[in-house]
A protein has these predicted regions:
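Short, small-residue-biased leader/transition segments that mark boundaries at the very start
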Residues: 1-2
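Small-molecule kinase domains that catalyze NTP-dependent phosphoryl transfer to phosphate-bearing small molecules
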Residues: 99-102, 107-155, 159-162
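Conserved beta-strand scaffold positions in the cores of enzyme catalytic domains, especially
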Residues: 28, 93-95, 139-141
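Helical mechanochemical/support elements of P-loop NTPase systems and associated helical scaffolds
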Residues: 30, 45-55, 81, 118-124, ...
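Conserved substrate/cofactor phosphate-moiety recognition/catalytic segment
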Residues: 6-61, 65
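ATP-dependent NMP and nucleoside kinases share a basic, alpha-helical "lid"
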Residues: 37-44, 48, 60-118, 124, ...
């Protein structure tokens, strides 16, 4: 997943609703919520960002092996850690690259992080002054700047069922 305000959580909620309507057990691991409760001891260094994703991936693994569909709505900037999670999940990893230009994310930003970064009050914003390594071969690319929410949710839904 890419930048903040790209549409990750909104899409995850749409997919979650469909899964619940099917009677499936489902959990969303949202990056902001996880940072509030599970990884609040971590900062935003490379090592801390990697550890954040590893912890989220481990929780997702535990839930998944117990029959829960897990939707991880997180900024995961580094390819090598995403690859580690793919191995951990052994065939149950489905990467959706929410491809949204930074200017669109900035326009959607309700927390004002992009404005703070632009004003010099915030550093380390993924994709701006901290690197983001796009996936090489994700299972699905969702360009939220050219699709409606409904189209994005439908694309994920169809890909999961193919």
């Amino acid at each position: 997943m890419l930048f903040r305000s790209a549409g990750k959580t909104t899409i995850a909620r749409g997919v979650e609703k469909r899964l619940l309507d099917e009677g499936r057990r489902v959990e969303i691991l949202d990056g902001d919520v996880v940072r509030t409760y599970l990884t609040k001891d971590l900062g935003y260094s490379r090592a801390d960002r990697d550890e954040n994703i590893r912890r989220i991936g481990f929780v997702a693994h535990l839930l998944s092996r117990n029959g829960v569909v897990v939707l991880c709505s997180v900024v995961s900037p580094y390819r090598d850690v995403r690859d580690e999670m793919r191995v951990l999940h052994d065939g149950r990893f489905f990467e959706v690259y929410v491809s949204t230009p930074v200017d669109v994310c900035s326009d959607r930003d309700v927390k004002g992080l992009y404005a703070k970064q632009k004003a010099g009050d915030l550093t380390g914003l993924t994709g701006i002054d901290d690197p983001y390594e796009p996936p090489v071969n994700p299972e699905l690319v969702v360009p939220t700047h050219t699709q409606t929410l409904e189209e994005s949710v439908e694309a994920v839904w169809q890909a999961l069922h193919s």
